[in-house]
């Protein structure tokens, strides 16, 4: 997932070859870009760890606190476009004011119910939530536990014959969120999700593989690991992020990532797969599986020694990754299916795609 919107039954999240995200479309308001002179609210470059309210470390993992029938009412604080002009789509960082009343853990998701989701046979609106992975730690971007952030790609449908956008087929929830203004009320469900949680062992290496907004849960990870001072959680392992996007303008949270890489050179690694700017070893486009393959031997060794591997993003990323890993496993004399099952059994293998 991501912020992703998740499950396949969510119409505006379902990705087809003809569902594209336009960066500029005449007559439609876009996410407001932040002026060059104004600091972005979507990134933190100050790497001096900040103190956070430890009460959020207490108790059991929150799960399904709010439902479609009884959602939580939150308000949008800000919406910021975080992709550049040459990106193939528009992605927004959205900060939501929750007042700490819908707590979550890193790796979980919120449901968002957009207005006018579905009308039943009696003419009444039926609330249907779209799921988005949360892109902040449980303490929010401010570190006080009063907000949560989403990373949302605006989904629009472009007719393959005319090349024009069809407003009737645009993603309902993603456009509602990207068009929101400060103070906009949103109905939320959740939190949900157990698949992408951080391991209890703070020494375990983390290998995170993302495409697009699949980076959202991993942002919650790296902020907990490197930006926040949590007395009960001192991350000492390796954090390795592989990120696949089209080009440099499509990189998400790169300033924050570069600041972490500079502050923790021996503990944080970052590798991009830029399909429209880089070539793989065979001269073709550099996709996420190609970049991961460059370090396959090291990754297999890390997994043999207790590393956790996470995948989040478009479901189309997984076949190429699985084919590559199966080929490498065979070269190493391993049965791929048994190898993966062994990792799943030890809870080292985490996949959430949409």
UniProtKB/Swiss-Prot annotation:
It is an enzyme of class 1 (oxidoreductase). It catalyses: 2 reduced [2Fe-2S]-[ferredoxin] + NADP(+) + H(+) = 2 oxidized [2Fe-2S]-[ferredoxin] + NADPH. The modification N6,N6,N6-trimethyllysine is found at residues 118, 124. NADP(+) binds at residues 133, 153, 213, 245-246, 275-276, 285, 313-314, 352. One of its GO terms (molecular function) is ferredoxin-NADP+ reductase activity. One of its GO terms (cellular component) is chloroplast stroma. CDD domains: CYPOR_like_FNR. Its cofactor is FAD. It is a peripheral membrane protein. FAD binds at residues 130-133, 151-153, 157, 172-174, 213. Gene3D superfamilies: Nucleotide-binding domain of ferredoxin-NADP reductase (FNR) module (3.40.50.80), Translation factors (2.40.30.10). It comes from the Eukaryota. The modification N6,N6-dimethyllysine is found at residue 170. Pathway: Energy metabolism; photosynthesis. It holds the Pfam family NAD_binding_1. Keywords: Chloroplast, Electron transport, FAD, Flavoprotein, Membrane, Methylation, NADP, Oxidoreductase, Photosynthesis, Plastid, Thylakoid, Transit peptide, Transport. Residues 69-198 form the FAD-binding FR-type domain. Its EC number is 1.18.1.2. One of its GO terms (biological process) is photosynthesis. Residues 1-35 form a transit peptide. Belongs to the ferredoxin--NADP reductase type 1 family. PANTHER family: PTHR43314. May play a key role in regulating the relative amounts of cyclic and non-cyclic electron flow to meet the demands of the plant for ATP and reducing power. This is Ferredoxin--NADP reductase, chloroplastic. It comes from Chlamydomonas reinhardtii. The lineage of its organism: Eukaryota, Viridiplantae, Chlorophyta, core chlorophytes, Chlorophyceae.
């Amino acid at each position: 997932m991501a912020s992703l919107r998740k499950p396949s039954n969510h119409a505006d999240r379902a990705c087809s070859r003809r569902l594209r995200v336009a960066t500029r479309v005449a007559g439609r308001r876009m996410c407001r870009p932040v002026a060059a002179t104004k600091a972005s609210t979507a990134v933190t470059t100050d790497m001096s760890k900040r103190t956070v309210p430890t009460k959020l470390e207490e108790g059991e993992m929150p799960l399904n606190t709010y439902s479609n029938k009884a959602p939580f009412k939150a308000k949008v604080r800000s919406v910021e476009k975080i992709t550049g002009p040459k990106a193939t789509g528009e992605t927004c960082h959205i900060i939501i004011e929750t007042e700490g009343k819908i707590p979550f853990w890193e790796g979980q998701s919120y449901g968002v119910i957009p207005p006018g989701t579905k009308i039943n046979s009696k003419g009444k609106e039926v609330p249907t939530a779209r799921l988005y992975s949360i892109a902040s730690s449980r303490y929010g971007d401010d570190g006080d536990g009063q907000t949560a952030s989403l990373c949302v790609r605006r989904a629009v449908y472009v007719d393959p014959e005319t090349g024009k956008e069809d407003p009737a087929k645009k993603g309902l929830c993603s456009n509602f969120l990207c068009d929101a203004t400060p103070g906009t009320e949103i109905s939320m469900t959740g939190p949900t999700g157990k698949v992408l949680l951080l391991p209890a062992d703070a020494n375990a290496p983390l290998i995170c593989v993302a495409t697009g907004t699949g980076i959202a849960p991993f942002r919650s990870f790296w902020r907990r690991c490197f930006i926040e001072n949590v007395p009960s959680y001192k991350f000492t392992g390796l954090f390795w992020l592989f990120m696949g996007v089209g080009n440099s303008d499509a990189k998400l949270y790169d300033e924050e990532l570069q600041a972490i890489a500079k502050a923790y050179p021996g503990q944080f690694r970052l590798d991009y797969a830029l399909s429209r700017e880089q070539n793989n070893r065979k001269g073709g486009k550099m996709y996420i599986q190609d970049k991961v393959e460059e370090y396959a031997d090291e990754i297999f060794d890390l997994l043999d020694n207790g590393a956790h591997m996470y995948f989040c993003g478009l479901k189309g990323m997984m076949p190429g990754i699985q084919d590559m890993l199966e080929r490498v496993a065979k070269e190493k004399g391993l049965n791929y299916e048994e190898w993966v099952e062994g990792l799943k059994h030890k809870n080292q293998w985490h996949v959430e795609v949409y």
